[in-house]
Swiss-Prot record:
EC number: 3.1.-.-, 5.6.2.5
Gene Ontology CC, one term: plasma membrane
Protein's name according to its UniProt entry: Protein PhoH2
Notes on temperature effects: Optimum temperature is 25-37 degrees Celsius for ATP and GTP hydolysis.
pH dependence per the UniProt record: Optimum pH is 7.4-8.0.
Function: Toxic component of a type II toxin-antitoxin (TA) system. The cognate antitoxin is PhoAT; expression in M.smegmatis (strain mc(2)155) requires the cognate M.tuberculosis antitoxin gene. Expression in M.smegmatis strain mc(2)155 of the toxin alone slows growth and reduces cell viability, effects which are abrogated when cognate antitoxin PhoAT is coexpressed. Unwinds and/or cleaves 5'-tailed RNA in vitro that starts with 5'-AC, the reaction requires hydrolyzable ATP; double-stranded (ds)RNA and dsDNA are not unwound or cleaved. Can be expressed in the absence of its antitoxin gene in E.coli.
Subunit structure as annotated in this protein's UniProt entry: Interacts with antitoxin PhoAT.
Keywords: ATP-binding, GTP-binding, Hydrolase, Isomerase, Magnesium, Metal-binding, Nuclease, Nucleotide-binding, Toxin-antitoxin system
């Protein structure tokens, strides 16, 4: 029996990676015709349009090269093939409840009919519901893994035992050379312990350990935990262009980011304005477009979360001044396509719900003099197409150690004991996702 498998791809895979068809080694890749139609429908989508157009261009290039796509053509360098499947659409092979006119049913019919012919079929999708449906009709299904990274669980913090003399030197000189810290990623926060003394530092771009002072503040906010102090130190460092703040709900991610932004705009005047982008997903993955009202009315609940945080950090007079002078914008991510953000302190809130390509698009919009902060909690992904090993997690692993990038996972909850208790209970109930 041949080891060659047949992989049926759905639209979500090609929107995630337009070059996916060439990444299945020696195996056969099948794209149902309905996927081409779905790509066509996404050509002008505010976030996914570029990826849809790129995938369609690649199919057109293959058409020009090979003449037709309804028969297997070679792709990649390892003997794999690709074809667009026009047949195998008969839904009779599916259970009665799945014989609908939906695109999902058409994709399932294609995969099931190929499997009925004896092929070793796997349906590949980034869409959780479609993978569940495939399993329900007896088909093998898998997530698209070609873009996955091995998530190391890197928190951005490290603990080192050292001599008390090193700690004294760090306080005296503000920076020391520690052999044990040279192999740590750039901007890693370090808890130094030795001889009854302790200090907090971080690895700088020169692989030296610089002191993180506990009295640093941004717009009146000081870090309470070691992680928050390191995060604040990074947020106030203009040389770090991308700062990633992870952590559970209530650990202070948004507060730190907003205070750093207001400090940059109002106090230091290094940036013109703070721009907060939020993805258009509600709890459960509902897109904003399904809600009634104008765009501003739809954005109300999303923007209010930012204003609630600000109200706890600044007086009403300061908040009114910031808004009246246009120093703060809260926008849906749909507004970032085609923009170049110059001299802006950009905050991408709830970044865990963004697919990697969308997140990279956001980062590519940064213009001269701009910085970006990503706040995220991997456990609260509302976009069902984002897994634990892609999206912001993949970006962190790829950028880890670069002098322009820093990441810190915040651990201590700053909300009420009730909120902290409920967060822990929910994690115990749902388990890892």
């Amino acid at each position: 029996m041949t080891d060659t498998r047949t992989y049926v791809l759905d639209t979500s895979v090609l929107l995630s990676d337009p070059w996916a068809c060439s990444r299945f080694a020696e195996h056969d890749v099948v794209v149902p015709l309905v996927v081409i139609s779905e790509l066509e429908a996404k050509r002008h989508h505010h976030e996914l349009g570029w990826f849809a157009r790129q995938a369609l261009r690649l199919f057109d290039d293959l058409r020009l090269e090979h003449g037709r796509l309804d028969q297997p053509i070679p792709v990649g360098t390892q003997g794999g093939t690709l074809h667009v499947e026009l047949n195998h659409t008969d839904p009779a092979v599916l259970p009665a409840g799945f014989r609908t006119d939906s695109n999902d049913s058409r994709i399932l019919s294609c995969a099931a009919n190929l499997a009925a012919e004896g092929k070793r079929v796997t349906l590949v999708s980034k869409d959780i519901p479609l993978r569940v449906k495939a399993a329900a009709v007896g088909l093998a299904a898998d997530e698209y893994h070609a873009q996955d990274v091995v998530v190391s669980g890197w928190s951005g913090m490290h603990e080192l035992e050292t001599a008390s003399a090193d700690i004294d030197a760090l306080f005296a000189d503000g920076e020391i050379d520690l052999v044990e810290a040279r192999d740590l990623p750039c901007h890693t926060g370090i808890r130094l312990l030795g001889g009854g003394s302790h200090a907090l530092g971080r690895v700088n771009a020169h692989k030296r350990v610089q002191l993180v002072r506990g009295d640093r503040e941004a717009f009146g906010l000081r870090g309470r935990s070691a992680e928050q102090r390191v995060a604040l130190d990074l947020l106030l460092d203009e040389s770090v262009g991308i700062v990633s703040l992870g952590g559970k709900a209530g650990t202070g991610k948004s507060a730190l980011a907003l205070c750093a932004g207001l400090e940059a705009v109002l106090e230091r005047r290094t940036h013109r304005k703070v721009v907060v982008f939020r993805p258009l997903y509600a709890v459960g993955g509902q897109e904003l477009g399904y809600l009634p009202g104008s765009e501003s009315e739809k954005m109300g609940p999303w923007a209010q979360a930012v204003f609630d945080t600000l109200e706890g950090l600044a007086s009403p007079a300061v908040l009114e001044e910031v808004l009246s002078r246009g120093m703060l914008e809260v926008l849906p991510l749909t507004h970032i396509r085609g923009r170049s953000l110059h001299d802006s302190f950009v905050i991408v809130d709830e970044a865990q719900s963004l697919e990697r390509n969308v997140l990279l698009t956001v980062l590519s919009r940064l213009g001269t003099g701009s910085r970006v902060v990503l706040t995220h909690d991997i456990a609260q992904r509302d976009n069902l197409r984002v897994g634990r090993h892609d999206g912001v997690a993949a970006v962190i692993e790829k950028l880890k150690g670069h002098p322009l990038f820093a990441h810190i996972t915040l651990l201590r909850s700053e909300r009420s004991p009730i909120a902290a208790l409920v967060t822990e209970m929910l994690e115990e109930i749902t388990g890892p996702r």
